[in-house]
Amino acid sequence: KKLPNLPPAQIGWAFTHVVEPIGRRTSKGEITCLDCGEVFHNTTKHKQCVCPHCGTKLLIEDTRKLNFKQREYAAYITTSDGLQVIRIFMVDYYAKIGKTPRYYLNEVMQRWIAPNGKFCTMARLRAWGTRYCDSWIYSSDLELRNETWAYGQIYTYDVYPRINLIPELKQHGCRKVLHDINTTDYFVALLMDNRAETLMKIGQEELLRHYLKRSGWNFDRYWPSIRIVARNGYIVKDASLWCDYLDALWELGKDLHSPKYVCPENLREEHDRYVVKLNRHREERRKAEREALILECEEAYQQAKARFFGLSFHDEKICIHVLESVREFFAEGEAMHHCVYSNGYYRKDDSLILSATIDGKRIETCLL
């Protein structure tokens, strides 16, 4: 079905809110407003300023070039025959010193979403043989296309503020679009994924954003805690930090069903405190594992190399002696910062490791 053309207000929004008018600044601090053509003086260190003649907010570019262009996407969300439609337009902006800027708006893609979450894509042809997934051929028609990864990469955060939603999306808690999230993925998740719907309805937008970015990966571990959070009216403001905090609690064996842990008053402070505890816990575990490995390998090393124990070479300054235990291998590796212990040289039957010292200070490790 052919959708109606955009009204002038929606077209004007794309030209004024999606692309940024440019102010070209020379080395003398003279800024040319490419929107109205007037020249004014401004040496601000900021990257933006307001033209005193036309009131346009300008993006300052310190350059000598005369031609400028921008290409951005604009999205409009509407409905048609009970289907949710996301219309994607390419906004092309061309400006030249001394001339009126030119704007073009071309519809390049439509995502049609059914109430059951299934969707299809109408799009123009794309040029092949380039490294860009959005080299649109404007002369081609909007036609039904096979779904490819490229269409999922084409989305924008510049969405026209007035949106129309199908009743099913409203029933699932949707009232607006989420910044930083592909709108198609967001709508489909609300229609098909109960967890996404729940997060939206309980007001956990940051958790929903994090959930969608990770495609729900590993959220089974967090879901019982999310229920506790919802029951206690706690709002997670930094979802990534909160999930990392729960991972630390889980590894430390804390109760993830307790509001005491999952609803911290100061998330950053509690996160940092438990990360310190976790690092200490991991170090103690590594020491225990290392000690167990040393005890396990000690007997075999003693049997294999006992006949060399006590062997040493020395003069007035240097002393070279055989390492007589696995624990000495560990101490040697730590002191000399090499892999004599970590690579298991004490297990090698065809090698003999010696340590060279001067006045008891290690200077070299020798392999025979």
Where are these regions (language model features)?
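N-terminal alpha-helical interaction blocks
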Residues: 1-23
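Intrinsically disordered, low-complexity regulatory segments
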Residues: 4, 21, 61-62, 69
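Short, flexible, mixed-charge glycine/proline-rich loop motifs
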Residues: 16-30, 39-46
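Eukaryotic N-terminal intrinsically disordered, low-complexity segments enriched in Ser/Pro
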Residues: 18-22, 101, 109, 125-127, ...
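Cys/His-enriched microdomains
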Residues: 29-34, 47-52, 352
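Cysteine-rich micro-motifs
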Residues: 44-60
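Long, charge-rich boundary regions
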Residues: 63-137
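Catalytic-core elements of nucleic-acid end-processing and repair enzymes
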Residues: 174-177, 186-188, 192-368
